[in-house]
């Protein structure tokens, strides 16, 4: 089964005839081709890739199962013609991606065609369940990320800045084969480590915790990992904070299984952190799905519905943290999957014992 046939099956099940896909990542997800100007028009039995002259040759070499169309004039007019040829009067669009301006533009061109939401829901549900090849690509992305962590431990010196560390991680990941970054790299030290999404500064590294949250993008798929180390020596409270986060993470990881209610994983980690006296200092959810998008479903969160359960093909992060405002913070993050045989696979191999440099 391909991502295209999965989508077409879901279209049929939804009672829909045709969908228009315009967002870059979803286009790549469905056809495997990375380009920035075009559309996919997918019906239950046909699929078109519409793009301009710049991408035609590459598309023909890379894409199968799609009819590749180069517009003779305006791209939207070409799509309108295809809609008319296929007797389409109702068109599913990506409700989560389409701006109001784009919606108005499409409505103005596609006269007599009703634009309805629904494509985003189908894609979200499909992306949540990875196929075997997707898990293999994510594993490769994480291997690049693990290698970057091993490298950075030998790079860090007191003369480095947070920005030095972030840029070195990024350079190394690209050197190892990453096509891009999964997200903006976080490398924050000392008091700045209390900011869960702190921005690296040009200041020299501060003593204390150094939190590094980074990931590679490989063949379109993301990895996501956080490690916190100590620059200098950890005092007793820092050791308590670190070990509490590590204990919470390991407990949640050990409990993960096929069929687990997602919010229960969050509760396991949160209860341990709360018991240690830091409940108010763990302000985000335990984890999120990862795929072509760095944040996907499912969510390991206290607010997740009871109906949200872990199933085969899910990839999630497990990333508890403790943040003491104006003092420091600590987060440890692994990325795991419920594998296709129902077992739990931890993609992340980097050490988690307290490291002092």
Residue ranges and their predicted role:
Residues 1-357:
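Active-site neighborhoods and metal-handling regions in enzymes and metal-associated proteins
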């Amino acid at each position: 089964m391909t991502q295209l046939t999965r989508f077409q099956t879901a279209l049929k099940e939804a009672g829909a005839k045709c969908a228009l896909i315009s967002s870059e990542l979803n286009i790549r997800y469905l056809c495997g081709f990375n380009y920035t100007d075009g559309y996919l028009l997918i019906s239950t039995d046909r699929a078109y890739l519409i793009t301009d002259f710049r991408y035609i040759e590459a598309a023909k070499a890379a894409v199968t199962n799609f009819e590749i169309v180069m517009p003779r004039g305006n791209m939207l007019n070409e799509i309108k013609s295809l809609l008319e040829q296929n007797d389409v009067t109702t068109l599913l669009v990506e409700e989560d991606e389409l701006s109001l301006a784009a919606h108005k533009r499409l409505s103005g061109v596609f006269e007599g065609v009703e634009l309805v939401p629904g494509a985003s829901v189908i894609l979200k549900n499909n992306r949540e369940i990875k196929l075997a090849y997707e898990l293999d690509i994510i594993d490769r992305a994480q291997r690049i990320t693990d290698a970057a962590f091993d490298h950075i431990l030998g790079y860090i010196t007191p003369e480095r800045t947070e920005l030095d560390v972030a840029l070195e991680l990024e350079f190394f990941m690209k050197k190892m084969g990453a096509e891009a970054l999964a997200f903006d790299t976080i490398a924050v030290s000392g008091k700045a480590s209390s900011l869960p999404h702190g921005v690296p500064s040009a200041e020299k590294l501060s003593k204390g915790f150094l939190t590094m949250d980074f990931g590679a993008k490989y063949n379109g798929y993301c990895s996501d990992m956080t490690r916190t180390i100590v620059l200098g020596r950890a005092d007793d409270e820092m050791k308590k904070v670190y070990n509490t986060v590590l204990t919470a993470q390991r407990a949640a990881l050990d409990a993960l299984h096929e069929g687990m209610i997602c919010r229960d994983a969050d509760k396991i980690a949160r209860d341990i952190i709360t018991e240690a006296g830091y409940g108010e200092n763990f302000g985000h959810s335990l984890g999120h799905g990862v795929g072509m998008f760095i944040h996907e479903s499912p969510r390991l969160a206290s607010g997740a519905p009871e109906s949200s359960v872990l199933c085969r093909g899910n990839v999630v992060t497990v990333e508890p943290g403790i943040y003491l405002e104006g003092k420091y913070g600590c987060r440890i993050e692994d990325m795991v999957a419920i594998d296709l045989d129902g077992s739990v696979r931890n993609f992340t191999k980097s050490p988690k014992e307290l490291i002092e440099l």
